[in-house]
């Protein structure tokens, strides 16, 4: 009956234990990341401009389409992603968080899991993805579990999809006459 989880088998006692595997790989990113973040945002005036510049940089890196499970849940260090100019979706998310943190922007990596009755009934294989911000995930957060790397629930800011347009039509006694 669709994508309904019937049985969960995990080598981890909790979601928090599973996420420790990811969290342990996010080391102190050091001088390389800090210098790059400063260089990329040198002309920016606002926090939003800085975030946008860093996002453009990270999105401009090459993509490696391997999933977390295909990489054995291994993330390369941020400096290695910078040096190689490519990364998996998860590595690029970790790099974006590191770059933002390096210039004092509060950023955290978040994880998405299928929603389960037992909040701890999910291991690494159930991890849908890692991200800093994701409007697509924000749209469906009522149907999935979004947590920080300590497995604490996170509520994402919903984006409005309302499109508004106003046209003004001026009608006079000469309208339509030739």
Describe the role of every protein-language-model region:
Residues 35, 69-80, 113-116:
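Short, conserved phosphate-binding/catalytic loop or strand-edge motifs used
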Residues 10-17, 21-32, 151-178:
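Acidic/His-rich catalytic or pseudo-catalytic neighborhoods
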Residues 1-72:
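Secretory-pathway-linked proteins and extracytosolic
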Residues 47, 51, 82, 86, ...:
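Active-site-proximal structural scaffolding
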Residues 54-58, 89, 100:
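Conserved hydrophobic/aromatic pocket- or pore-lining residues that grip, position, or stack substrates
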Residues 14, 24-32, 75-81, 88, ...:
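Extended non-catalytic domains of envelope/secretory-pathway proteins
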């Amino acid at each position: 009956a669709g994508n309904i989880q019937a049985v969960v088998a995990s080598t981890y006692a909790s979601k928090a234990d599973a996420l420790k595997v990811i969290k342990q790989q996010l080391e102190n990113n050091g001088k390389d990341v800090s210098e790059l973040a400063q260089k990329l945002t040198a002309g920016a005036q606002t926090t939003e401009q800085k975030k946008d510049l860093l996002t453009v940089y990270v999105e401009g890196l090459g993509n490696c389409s391997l999933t977390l499970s295909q990489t054995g849940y291994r993330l390369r260090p941020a400096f290695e992603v910078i040096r190689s100019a490519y990364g998996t979706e998860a590595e690029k998310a970790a790099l974006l968080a590191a770059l933002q943190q390096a210039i004092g922007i509060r950023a955290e990596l978040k994880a998405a899991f299928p929603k389960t009755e037992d909040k701890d009934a999910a291991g690494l294989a159930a991890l849908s993805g890692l991200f800093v911000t994701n409007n697509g995930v924000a749209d469906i957060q009522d149907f999935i579990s979004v947590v920080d790397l300590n497995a604490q629930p996170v509520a994402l800011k919903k984006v409005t999809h309302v499109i508004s347009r106003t046209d003004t039509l001026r009608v006079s006694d000469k309208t339509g006459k030739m």
